[in-house]
Swiss-Prot record:
HAMAP family: Glu_tRNA_synth_type1. Keywords: Aminoacyl-tRNA synthetase, ATP-binding, Cytoplasm, Ligase, Nucleotide-binding, Protein biosynthesis. GO terms for molecular function: ATP binding; glutamate-tRNA ligase activity; tRNA binding; zinc ion binding. PROSITE patterns: AA_TRNA_LIGASE_I. It is found in: Cytoplasm. This is Glutamate--tRNA ligase. It is an enzyme of class 6 (ligase). The lineage of its organism: Bacteria, Pseudomonadati, Pseudomonadota, Betaproteobacteria, Neisseriales.
Amino acid sequence: MTVKTRFAPSPTGYLHIGGVRTALFSWAFARHHKGEFLLRIEDTDLARSTAESVNIILDGMKWVGLDYDNADNVVYQTRRFDRYKEVIAELLAKGDAYYCYCSKEELEAMREKAEKEGTATYDRRWRPEAGKTLPEIPAGVQPVVRFKTPLDGVTKWTDLVKGEISIPNEALDDLIIARADGTPTYNFCAVVDDYDMGVTHIIRGDDHVNNTPKQINILKAIGANLPEYGHLPMILNEQGKKISKRSGDTVAITDFGAMGILPEAMLNYLARLGWAHGDDEFFTTEQFIEWFDLKDVSPSPSRMDLKKLYWINGEHIKITPDGKLTELVKPRLALRDIHETEKPALEDVLALVKDRAQDLNALADECLYFYKKQVPAEADVAKHWDDEAAARMLRFAERLEGLEDWNAKAIHDLFKPFCDEEGIKMGKLGMPLRLAVCGTAKTPSVDAVLALISKEEVLKRIRA
């Protein structure tokens, strides 16, 4: 059997971080088992499902690197209405579905009664049964189509995350599978799609647990082999509450990209939200695929920890090739009005500073002083700069100007003799030198920094 999983987002304007975690686990499960990962766009909400909102999903999937095996044949529900109507007609013909003519007022009365009695909402008055007389069909009423849910027994499955789950069928309504205007409903469309796509494992959020028994009964009615189900726990914000855009939480996956998070780090972090491989916190996507097993997913909710996300991101920045980092940082430098990054070569700069930042924006900031002296912080000036330091910098500039070879070793070899002559420790030279050349007291080894900045530029900055 070829394992087939799917990710089925609805285009709502952004790709939710929780959806990406679901997609990641589905993708990793398929890749681990050498199977297929499929994408389906559940776009039946025509008011919200614009081309732009669909592209946001596709772009988000591309950014995080979750490739899908039906890229040339993505399933769109709006293109499958004829298929849904065909299956509904089959269910009606077999007696597994029926027309219901209840008015809104009748349904509301049933709902109130059910809440009081703790029973299923719909009283099944239009459900055909042997020996039962149905009400007279009202004039001018367009019926909905309901699925004929079994009245006895239980619907159960062994959830790949939550374990054994059992729901009494008497607790289930006769689900509406087609509205009065003929459009099919979510649960029905999802069942038909999963059946036609050959999905073997449905991995999704645990907010779908209550949908599962309804979908299982429909699958049985159409004669399908049942897939296995795994329901993932919710992701909570740092306060332990449901992630919400209204609460100021970052929820769109593209927003994390704007924050300077690498896609590989995002996947690494999301993988650790609910799944564990021993004490491993930092790993590559390839390692995650190799290690991933749903039995290692906790059924308990996971809590966001942005501090840990940034730490993981910093670790991924360290192992990212300098050439790749260059392409990621260059546009961020352009936003900071640094457009010429050939002298010094940005790739060389990044090789020196990439272990000093935990996101790409901070990394771009770390590169600025190589191209333009920054305005020093008042606290640094007060601590490391005075008239004596200024005079000392001019004297050291003369030593630098005398160098024939401009490299880190040659610059470093000037430090000790100069400090001995001045009767000072290295800090009295290094910190003012950083301020004079870079505009900050926090840099990598100052000889390496000066070596990357040209001799002419270093002397110009010191003597400015």
